[in-house]
């Protein structure tokens, strides 16, 4: 399932060679689901062309070629902070742009009517130095952060998030955020339903499938030899009678 979502959603949304209605991406997965690792893989391939050959699924590797090495990537994880989402994003962008040799400073919040113009000006400065590259911003733990925000603060954060999603359509700027559950279905945000709906229009959600997590654990993290499987079976068999259908599912265990 995850390979299909990468091929059909993630890579097409990130690419900028073909005109498209590009949107921001939300990677949805609970703690331990591999959400952060998936974002790391996507952003690493986007940053370094040679890494795409390390993707074991041939179809995914082929589809990844449209973004491989095409981006300068900026990464951050939101922790305990009272900063607005705009201030967080602006701080990360300005710090990393300086490292890339791009001189750009965002105006203060009190000086802008909307943020799209500032993002467009930033990308114009970026493209002067890197005309063949896009800019990818990866933000983890977005949902936990939004849950800490007060009513008015949250509305401003969501409006900024919508603007970020909107500029992805016309610029070589891309945005990926990691959330623990589907942002648009979170009952805690029911009071800002209209703002959530407008954000939904400019973002694609990519859910990490449970069967893919199971496959990665079995085939990548904890792959076992036949001898190891035999020893585990011998150890577990005496306990099977205490756990429902464990006997029938022994191969999975």
Which residue stretches match the model-derived regions?
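N-terminal pre-Walker A segment at the start of P-loop NTPase domains
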Residues: 1-18
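P-loop NTPase nucleotide-binding core
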Residues: 21-139, 143-159, 186, 195
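Segments forming glycine/polar-rich beta-alpha architectures that bind adenosine-containing cofactors
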Residues: 43, 177, 253
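Short, surface-exposed basic-aromatic patches at helix termini and helix-loop junctions that form
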Residues: 45-48, 166-169, 190-200
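Hydrophobic/aromatic interaction determinants used to assemble and anchor large protein complexes
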Residues: 100-104, 128-129, 168-170, 228, ...
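Substrate-engagement module of ASCE P-loop NTPases
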Residues: 121-129, 156-175, 199-202
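Structural recognition of the conserved hydrophobic beta-strand(s) that form the central parallel beta-sheet
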Residues: 136-140, 166, 172-181, 185
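Amphipathic alpha-helical segments of the small helical/lid subdomains adjacent to P-loop NTPase cores
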Residues: 186-253
């Amino acid at each position: 399932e995850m390979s299909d979502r990468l091929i059909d959603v993630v890579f097409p949304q990130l690419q900028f060679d073909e005109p498209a209605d590009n949107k921001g991406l939300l990677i949805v997965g609970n703690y331990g689901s591999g959400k952060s690792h998936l974002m790391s893989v996507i952003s690493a391939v986007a940053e370094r062309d040679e890494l795409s050959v390390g993707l074991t699924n041939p179809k995914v590797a082929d589809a990844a070629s449209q973004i491989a090495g095409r981006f300068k990537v900026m990464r951050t994880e939101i922790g305990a902070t009272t900063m607005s989402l705009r201030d967080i994003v602006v701080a990360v962008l300005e710090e990393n742009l300086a490292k890339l040799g791009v001189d750009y400073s965002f105006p203060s919040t009190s000086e802008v009517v909307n943020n799209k113009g500032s993002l467009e000006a930033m990308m114009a400065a970026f493209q002067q130095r890197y005309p063949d590259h896009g800019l990818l911003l990866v933000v983890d733990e977005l949902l936990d952060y939004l849950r800490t925000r007060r009513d008015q603060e949250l509305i401003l954060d969501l409006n900024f998030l919508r603007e970020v999603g909107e500029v992805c359509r016309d610029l070589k700027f891309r945005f990926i955020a990691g959330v623990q559950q589907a942002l648009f279905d979170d009952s805690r945000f029911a009071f800002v339903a209209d703002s959530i709906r407008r954000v939904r229009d400019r973002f694609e959600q990519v859910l990490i499938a449970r069967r893919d997590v199971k496959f990665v654990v079995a085939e990548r993290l904890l792959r076992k030899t036949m001898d190891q499987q035999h020893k585990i079976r011998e150890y577990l068999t005496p306990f099977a009678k205490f756990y429902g259908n464990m006997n029938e599912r022994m191969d999975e265990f």
